[in-house]
Amino acid sequence: SGQVSKQEKPVYGRMFQTPFADRVRNEAGADLGIGFMAWMHPPCHRLLGWSTRPSAFGPRRNVWRLNQLVAMAEAEVIVRGEAASTDQETLALLPTLLDAELLGKQQTCLGRLVDAVVELRSGKILHYLVARSDPRLPGTSRWRLDPERLLDQQSGQVITALEELDDLPLE
């Protein structure tokens, strides 16, 4: 890989489990692995960073702070600096709402939080995207959910007063 051109840091960016099923490279173009999961501060709906898996095999994971993100291109994220090295067991302790079940007013599962639109400079989550089925399937609808509509958060699930997903706008 050659030199990657530096781009203006975007103000907003869509993040799939944050930018981050994408390929991660440093500014010199070196491959640093595939994005793995986002970590956040759920009570404030703020993205703090994400992790990458440098290799398909092995337990090692790298954790990146949001302020290390330099640019986002199609299926690629450019970072600056060194990641913190960790393992899967430690990553499991980092908080995230992504992939949590969304429970409605009747405590029934309406879908999952599968993505977020984030203001990259501050990490503020502007809204979550909810999918009823597997978000990797082509044609899967996504609904926009404002963080203010969440009533409660527990491990692996968030609760809202929604009756159904059709109460939300489609993304």
Segments (PLM) and residue ranges:
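Peripheral interaction segments used for macromolecular assembly
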Residues: S1-E171
